[in-house]
Amino acid sequence: TRPKVVVTPESQTWQTVGKPEKKVDAVKLVQGKPAFTADMDARGMLYAKVLHSPHAHARIKKIDTSKAKELKGVAAVLTYQDIPRVVYSTAGQSDPIPGPLDTFSLDHKVRFVGDRVAFVAAESPEIAEKALSLIDVEYEILDSILDSRQAIDANAIRIHDEPEYVDFGDSNADKNLAAHIRIDIGDEKKGFAEADEIFEAEYEVPKVQQAHIEPHVCV
């Protein structure tokens, strides 16, 4: 038997649903009065900058931070050699698609353009930016993967070859597979057999964020 759809009658006691809500901070926002995280300036505060990789896939053969450390106003310069090597997941979701442990704060290998290479903390954003330009990095350029079909090819290079990698669910580093999920609704074979027309196509979707709630600034 097919499930019965029950429609809940509209409740007259609702105070918010279906009614306009006043934006209590609208006036202050248009006047520029509220202080956001990036507006805070504590006494003696340092400013951090990140050196990003220009390469999609490479190993760091050598990294020289001596000139950056000598720059006046620089408090610290960190590379993968200076911090604990702790693997973690950047995925915020859990089952049915848990993320594998495949990320390090800093690593001797970069896996995408923009990957983190070094951190700098300085007395001003300008000094920190200057320090980044003084860091000398020698890369061993590796073959890169720019297409998802290429990534899952049997002969594709392995992006995550680190021994610390931890699989979750159907993820598989050997196949460059971060996650896999299949959802079937109804009798698929019967549906195809009874269909008057069958349309086949491939669809590619960009990376999306449904709710922008994660912080992008911290003090």
Regions found by a protein language model. Name each.
Residues T1-S171, I198-A201:
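Flexible, low-hydrophobicity surface segments
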